[in-house]
């Protein structure tokens, strides 16, 4: 019997579920995750009209796509995940979907850059509750030997959402304006929210874990009950250290707003609010933090994923504008072109990463980070080759045709786009095995906090800032060179994930 302070929700399902229902739930979660990325990534395809409307530099647009979203998305994920470990995960996801979709629609009525910045923060508030609870649900619907593939299937929402946001958002913006694009995709999520709530049930926590079925750990002390000693001293250090992180993020946010010319009184208010959210979030997570943050594998996996996300989010957010500047494509053409790359390459890469890792993981747990480590080593040169393929085609006898150059570039871009997402299934599955079942949502949220604060916030801004920095030397081609410089993050990610492959076996929790 569990204590009331951390009891599972009363509606939790105790009876076994059928395979068909399990896959139905996975399909619904994939669709919700797709909407998550539609609303998150639509801003990339709308870069040109938004920059024109509000007269933004690349650096300012990078702040809009990065820190405006990531600052609240990353930090609020922890208290919402903590709540999901103690209450209905489905209710939390339903509310989150409604909030982020509503704020996406509000972006369509923004009358100034400051309003758009705040509405993008609202999108981040909602999306903070949409991922970690889903990871926990999947872990409780699928047994350990199927989790990497299930996580990979869930991650299909990323290329589906990126492609959908690019195609739908771009075409709507080209024909009806960018405001219509925001409103249309936002209202779609509001309509889907009731379906999620009414058809998806919370499964028994830890019910698919053989070890969990044999033992019932005390809810108040799940770590020690699973043979994992707690360390209250470390927990306090994690909580106190949160305020150092909060201070740094508050300073960064304040400087960002100051650089955008936002009224001075808003700067300390925003900074103080962000300080409080991050501090309270990590104080809430200190018990889980005392379990997973002592593990070297957690840091290597988290920082490795974050390094790759600097490129992943950055390239995904800026490639549409790159195609318009360097490939001379229109907004409608880019919508179809990049949507195809994101969809085909992304689906293949995610499924390949999960399938290969599950197969190799039966022999060695180190395969889970090793598969994406190898993938990233291949990604960097392939991106550079794809970006230069029109120039290479031009060296052919007769100079080649523009159509041939675009086709060749499309085919080459599929390779790094797929490999870029190969980490999602293996790494997220591995993180689920670094903590016992009652801590999985919070463990996932801490992982996502690191990944998104370093990856999403830094990545989107980095490429815009570097593009502005290089513009005096390279003009309209500055974005190309900015993306080149970012490829080093893939190499860093490979090194970190290679390290995780050597430590994961020791830290693994069945």
What are these regions (language model features)?
Residues 369-426:
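C-terminal transmembrane helical hairpin of 12-TM major facilitator-type secondary transporters
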Residues 64-81, 340-353:
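Central cavity-lining transmembrane alpha-helices of secondary-active solute carriers
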Residues 46-75:
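Extracellular/periplasmic helix-loop-helix junction of adjacent transmembrane segments
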Residues 154, 158-201, 232-270:
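Helix-loop-helix hairpin linking two adjacent transmembrane segments in secondary transporters
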Residues 75-114:
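Conserved MFS/SLC helix-loop-helix module at the cytosolic interface between two early adjacent transmembrane helices
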Residues 43-44, 242-268, 296-346, 350, ...:
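Extracytoplasmic gate region of multi-pass secondary transporters
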């Amino acid at each position: 019997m569990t204590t009331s302070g951390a009891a599972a929700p009363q509606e939790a399902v105790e009876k076994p579920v059928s395979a068909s229902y399990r896959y139905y739930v996975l399909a619904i979660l994939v669709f919700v995750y797709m909407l998550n990325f539609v609303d998150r990534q639509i801003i990339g395809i709308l870069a040109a009209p938004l920059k024109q409307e509000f007269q933004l530099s690349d650096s300012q647009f990078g702040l809009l796509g990065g820190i405006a979203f990531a600052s609240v998305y990353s930090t609020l994920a922890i208290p919402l995940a903590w709540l999901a470990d103690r209450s209905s995960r489905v209710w939390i996801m339903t509310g989150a979907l409604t909030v982020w979709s509503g704020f996406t629609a509000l972006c369509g009525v923004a009358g100034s850059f400051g309003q758009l910045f705040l509405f993008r923060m609202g999108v981040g508030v909602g999306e903070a509750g949409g991922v970690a609870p889903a990871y926990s649900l999947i872990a409780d619907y699928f047994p350990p030997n199927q989790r990497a593939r299930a996580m990979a299937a869930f991650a299909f929402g990323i290329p589906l959402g990126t492609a959908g946001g690019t195609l739908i958002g771009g075409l709507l913006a080209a024909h009806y304006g960018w405001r219509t694009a925001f409103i249309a995709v936002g209202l779609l999520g509001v309509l889907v929210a009731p379906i999620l709530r009414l058809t998806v049930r919370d499964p028994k926590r830890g019910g698919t874990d053989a070890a969990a079925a044999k033992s019932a750990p005390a809810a108040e002390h799940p770590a020690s009950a699973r043979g994992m000693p707690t360390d209250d001293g470390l927990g306090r250090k994690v909580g106190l250290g949160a305020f150092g992180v909060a201070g740094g993020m508050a300073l960064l946010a304040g400087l960002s707003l100051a650089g955008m010319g936002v009224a001075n009184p808003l700067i300390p208010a925003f900074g103080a609010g962000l300080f409080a959210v991050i501090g309270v979030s990590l104080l809430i997570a200190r018990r889980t933090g005392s379990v997973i943050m002592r593990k070297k594998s957690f840091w290597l996996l988290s920082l490795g994923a974050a390094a790759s996300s600097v490129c992943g989010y950055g390239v995904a957010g800026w490639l549409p504008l790159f195609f318009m500047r360097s490939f001379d494509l229109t907004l409608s053409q880019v919508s179809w072109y990049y949507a195809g790359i994101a969809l085909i390459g992304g689906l293949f890469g995610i499924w390949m990463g999960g399938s290969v890792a599950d197969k190799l993981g039966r022999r060695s747990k180190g395969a889970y980070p090793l598969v994406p480590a190898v993938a990233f080593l291949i990604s960097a040169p392939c991106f550079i080759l794809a970006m230069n393929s029109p120039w290479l085609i031009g060296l052919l006898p007769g100079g080649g045709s523009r159509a041939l150059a675009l086709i060749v570039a499309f085919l080459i871009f599929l390779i790094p786009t797929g490999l870029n997402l190969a980490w999602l299934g293996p790494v997220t599955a591995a993180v689920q095995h670094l903590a016992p079942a009652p801590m999985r949502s919070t463990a996932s949220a801490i992982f996502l906090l690191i990944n998104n604060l370093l990856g999403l916030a830094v990545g989107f801004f980095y490429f815009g800032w570097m593009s502005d920095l290089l513009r005096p030397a390279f003009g309209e081609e500055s974005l190309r060179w900015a993306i080149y410089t970012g490829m080093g993050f893939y190499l860093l990610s490979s090194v970190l994930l290679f390290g995780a492959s050597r430590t994961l076996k020791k830290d693994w929790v069945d």
